[in-house]
């Protein structure tokens, strides 16, 4: 299951530090960040594309209130973040 999450953040550095500080939870939930970065012209808007190994991992991530508090403390605007499940038919790291 791949999910795209987009939304406002304070700074990428704070967001990235929060992610690194939660590496055990990322492993626990079976998360792999395929992409995480801000828009070139707007450093306060982040896009992440995350692969979850299982639907249970995604559900556990969504239910982790402690993690969401840490995300908010790191400057993630949770109220204005949008999560979009992506289709299973995809190209990944295709180089032609």
Tell where the protein language model's regions lie, with residue ranges:
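Short amphipathic alpha-helical segments
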Residues: 11-34, 66-71
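Serine/threonine-rich low-complexity intrinsically disordered regions
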Residues: 8-11, 54, 65, 77, ...
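Low-complexity, intrinsically disordered regions enriched in charged/polar residues
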Residues: 20, 61, 84-85
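Generic "edge-of-domain/loop-turn" microfeature
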Residues: 12-14, 55-57, 91
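Glycine-rich beta-strand-turn "strand-cap" elements at beta-sheet edges
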Residues: 29-47, 70-96
